[in-house]
Each structure stands twice: as C-alpha cells, then as structure tokens.
C-alpha cells in the first residue's frame, strides 16, 4: 500500500527557486507565500499542520540521504517553526506549525547549526569514499549512504572485512584531503555531457531524475552526481573520524563516520 501523500490537490505552481544551491551558507531570506496546504499524510512531524510553498527558499528538502532543514518562517502577522522540509515534484514544501496567507511576504531563517552539521557529514561521506577507493582499489563503490546531524554512514563494496588499521589509513587520508584541498567544485551539466565527460561512476549515489545533473567534485579525489548541500571549502569540516565498520551483507562494509 502506497503511503498517503503529504498534501492533497497540490496546485500548479512555478518551481521553487533553490537558494541553497546559489549560496550554501545563506541563512536568512525573504520570500512570497504561493500556497498554504493542510498536511494529511502519514510521515508528518508531530506539531506540523501546514505545508508552505514559497517562490524561493534556503531550506534544503530531504533527499539524497540528507535530512531536510529546520528553522522558522515569520511575517508581520504570524511566526511558525519549520519542523522538516520535503520535495514534492518541483516544489519545496516547508512543514510548518501553522498557516500563512497566500501572498504573505515571509522572512525565513535556517537552523544553521543543524544544517552545518548535515553539510559536515555529507561532504565527509564523499571524502571518505574517495579515500577508500584510493587506498583499497577501484572496485570500491558506494552501495548506500545516510547523513544525519550526529553522524553519517557509508556502505562500500569490498571483498573482505576492514581492519582497524584499514579504517585508520582511510581516516588519515580523508583528513589530508580536508587540509590540502582548498575548494570543492559544484557544477550543473546536461546528463549526456556529464555521462560523456565522467562516465557512469558519477551515479554511485543513484542516478538523479531530470536532464540536468548537479555534480560535486573534490579535486581529483572524488566526483559524483549529488544534489545535497556541501561546504565550499573542505577545511570547514574540521576533522573526520571513522568510528567503526560492520558488515551489512557479504561484500558490503558500513563505515560509521563522525565529522565536525
């Protein structure tokens, strides 16, 4: 049985402008309310009552293994917490503790400490994956990943269990990358151009939908299709630790990562 959708009868609206791609460190913004929809689905945070659609937003919607942003939206007549952010088609839906009127101009503010930790962990997953590939061999492939506020996990394909020494070497190389690579490179390419230029290794995290592909490149260390939010400068992560690993199934190791 399919899960009940978050909202019923979504109106036809222009795609939400993703300010989180234009400036990943932007924490405040002004926007116009295009729709205010009562939430009716099953997977709704306790206290959230309405899904707010804006013309633009800094709030990153859950996707690609990265949790959605939290924060606050307010206008002259109301102020509501945002308890999660989701994507519905081309629209970003802010799950709010109350309603606004269509046409309201609102001020949005991110829960920045949460977003920063999510960025720490998401960028760290890419760096650790690249380090594992360089040290263990080109057979290393991302089989899955999850990034939360407190930690991240990365599932990689490998033919034997990883020792603590293996983990220490991967961790050491990952921290070298943080120190030595000054900037990450983010680009959007047409899918055919991306395939031609970089090959199908781009899609280790899964092939994204649409004709345009957003790509994260960390020097010659790692390059992947990824729609998440990432630090412009790897050094902002601070430090990466690989806490432990365990076997998820034959030939797949799960690395437990803490960054920041």
Question: What feature does the model see in each segment?
Answer:
Residues 1-260:
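A glycine- and charged-residue-rich anion-binding loop/surface
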């Amino acid at each position: 049985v399919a899960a009940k959708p978050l909202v019923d009868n979504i109106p036809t609206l222009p795609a939400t402008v993703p300010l989180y791609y234009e400036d990943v460190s932007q924490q405040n913004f002004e926007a116009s309310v295009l729709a205010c929809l009562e939430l009716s689905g099953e997977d709704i945070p306790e206290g959230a009552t309405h899904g707010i659609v804006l013309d633009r937003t800094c709030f990153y919607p859950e996707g690609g293994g990265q949790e959605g942003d939290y924060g606050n939206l307010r206008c002259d007549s109301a102020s509501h917490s945002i308890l999660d952010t989701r994507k519905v088609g081309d629209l970003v839906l802010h799950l709010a503790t109350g309603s606004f009127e269509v046409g309201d101009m609102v001020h949005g503010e991110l829960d920045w400490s949460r977003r920063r930790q999510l960025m720490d962990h998401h960028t760290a997953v890419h760096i650790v994956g690249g380090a594992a590939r360089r040290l263990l061999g080109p057979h290393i492939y991302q089989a899955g990943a999850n990034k939360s506020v407190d930690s991240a996990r990365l599932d990689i394909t490998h033919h034997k269990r990883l020792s603590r020494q293996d983990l220490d070497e991967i961790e050491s190389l990952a921290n070298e990358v943080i120190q030595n690579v000054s900037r990450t490179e983010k680009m959007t390419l047409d899918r055919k151009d991306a395939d031609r230029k970089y090959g199908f290794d781009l899609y280790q995290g899964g092939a994204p939908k649409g004709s345009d592909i957003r790509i994260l490149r960390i020097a010659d260390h790692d390059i992947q299709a990824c729609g998440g939010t990432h630090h412009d400068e790897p050094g902002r992560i601070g430090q990466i630790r690989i806490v432990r690993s365990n076997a998820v199934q034959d030939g797949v190791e799960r690395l437990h990562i803490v960054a920041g």
